[in-house]
Design a protein with these regions (language model features):
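NAD(P)H-binding glycine-rich loop region in Rossmannoid oxidoreductase-like domains
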Residues: 6, 41, 47-96, 100-103, ...
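SDR active-site strand-loop-helix element
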Residues: 9, 35, 72-73, 109-115, ...
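Short, polar loop motifs at secondary-structure junctions
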Residues: 33-41
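Oxidoreductase cofactor-interface core, primarily capturing Rossmann-like NAD(P)-dependent enzymes
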Residues: 25-30, 45, 119-216
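Short, glycine/serine-rich, charged loops/turns that create anion-binding
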Residues: 13, 39, 77, 116
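Conserved Rossmann-fold NAD(P)-dependent oxidoreductase catalytic core, especially the SDR/UDP-sugar
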Residues: 83, 88-134, 138-147
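N-terminal Rossmann NAD(P)H-binding glycine-rich loop of SDR-like oxidoreductase domains
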Residues: 3-28
């Protein structure tokens, strides 16, 4: 059986790093091409890192022929600096990679979205996430997997990211009140999200949504 060629964007983020590790450990994957503003810290014979400026390379004309693409690129409005800058990364850059990947023959796509994603939401963050989901659905990939994790748990310090005050509070409360919190809204490990999406994408047919509770 021919080995799969995979494209990933956002491989230096919390979930993206776990997805990349899973792909590199998978014997059925022959090539992994990562796109990002900086290369992953991981090195592997089957990994090719492409450092890109998403603002100046919206079309990515040189992507290799591939089977799957994983979109794990994301930020926060605080880090991006404005709603416009946030949208440019979470919506524009992810969608540009999806289009380029489809042009390169990709038929299966996995997206790391968020609980609450809704194109009609009054919350800007949720609305952008929902708009991206809708845009990808319209592209008619043979298989589309959308993972909607709740509060992510992982080692931000290892990623060179500051700890987020809201996350610490959410984790503390969830430990005390876990019996009151629905499964879809309980914190989830980034590794669990990666494992779920890596399992679902290769066999996906049509649109599939993975809610946080189903990924634990």
């Amino acid at each position: 059986m021919a080995k799969r060629t995979v494209i990933i964007v956002g491989a230096t983020g919390m979930v993206g790093r776990e997805i990349l590790a899973g792909l590199l450990a998978d014997d059925s994957v022959g090539e992994v091409h990562s796109l990002g503003r900086r290369p992953p810290t991981m090195q592997h014979p089957k990994l090719t890192a492409h450092v890109v400026n998403f603002a100046s390379q919206p079309l990515f004309p040189n992507l290799p022929q591939a089977d799957e693409v994983y979109l794990a690129l994301g930020t926060t409005i605080k880090v991006a600096g404005s709603q416009q800058a946030f949208r440019a990364i979470d919506y524009d850059a992810n969608l540009a990679v999806a289009r380029a990947a489809q042009a390169a023959g990709v038929t299966k796509l996995g997206l790391v979205s968020a609980m609450g994603a809704d194109a009609s939401s009054s919350v800007f963050y949720n609305r952008v996430k929902g708009e991206l989901e809708e845009a990808l659905e319209k592209m008619s990939f043979a298989g589309l997997v959308i993972a909607r994790p709740s509060l992510l748990v992982g080692d931000r310090e290892a990623l060179g990211q500051p700890a987020r005050r809201g996350e610490k509070l959410g984790l503390a409360l969830s430990k005390v009140l876990s019996f009151l919190i629905p499964a879809n809204y309980q914190p989830i490990a980034a590794a669990a999200v990666a494992k779920a999406i890596l399992t679902a994408v290769p066999q996906a047919q049509g649109k599939n949504i993975l809610l946080s509770g189903a990924m634990h």
